[in-house]
Amino acid sequence: MKLTVDLGPNSYPIHIENGILAKTGELVSEVFSGKKIMIVSDDNVFPLYGEIITKTLSDSGFECHSFVLPHGEPTKSFQSLPKIYEALLNAKLTRSDLLIALGGGVIGDLAGFAASSYLRGIKFVQIPTSLLAQVDSSVGGKVAVDLPQGKNLVGAFYHPKAVIIDPDVLNTLPDHFISDGMGEVIKYGCIKDKELFELLCRHTSFDDLKPKLTQIIARCVDIKRIVVEADQFDFGERILLNFGHTLAHTIEQHFHYERESHGEAVGIGMYQITKIAEEKGLTTSGCAEQIKKALEIYKLPDNSNLPIDVLTAAISLDKKNLNNHLNVVLLHDIGNSYVYPTDVSFFDGAGIV
């Protein structure tokens, strides 16, 4: 399956197919006519897929280099950037060369930001290997690194030349990372697709859902494609993709990215903000309970056991907080979301979340 993100001169294809990694060289040749390629990956992913990617690229006539970083959220830091730049310089990559981000969301965001800033920008291709990256972070052109004060505080809008999604790579993912990705899949159903949400709730586990996985990945990517085409720079409808993220980012930060994964934190954020919105009469009653049921099916938590006042200081630094005005994403109902302008006082009295 091939989708196209239509952004004029920044348009790019998204390829979704089982076993497509073996065609990487052919697909890269369609969007890149240079010679050198740097594969940036991590020490979990590269041992699994580095060889097949390097072979297919070499067979297509490319000169391949690789740089492998430690896995995990702490790698997505400002301190990792000089290491990538040094590897690019040592391999003598120029502005006419290409970087491939081979990994999950951390590698995609970090390597994408390195590509956006090295020599004022070189081409890059996303090959996401986690469910979360396949359905969300690899598409849309947001690249970033974290700072101690919060997630994604230094970044850019920088689109890849292509995204190559192989659902087969998910067979090597531990259950924890599958649940992580399902947090974002549930989000898409909540904000834009009631049918998708109901499909998720009709199944009893991820294993039960697996035969429909390629279809579900494609549906999530298509929703994101439509939203990004309408709002490339996050000023309007694209904000809807942040459903659950206001609380999620602060929960992740509070625990130094060592307890809840991103998808788990998004699950907590979606449920808790919907519960608050229902109490304020801003969301149809019963939505929070439906979200909780979906989270239970896919082994995701619904609370962090933190007092809200512990989180509100970090919320004030959130990117969605502009001039002390906070845009939170709420649901009218499942599948129908909207942006609600408020401020940090929205969370007053929420108690333990």
Segments from the language model and where they lie:
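A glycine/threonine-rich phosphate-anchoring loop and its flanking beta-alpha core
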Residues: 15, 113-205
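Non-catalytic interfacial helical region
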Residues: 85-102, 111-126
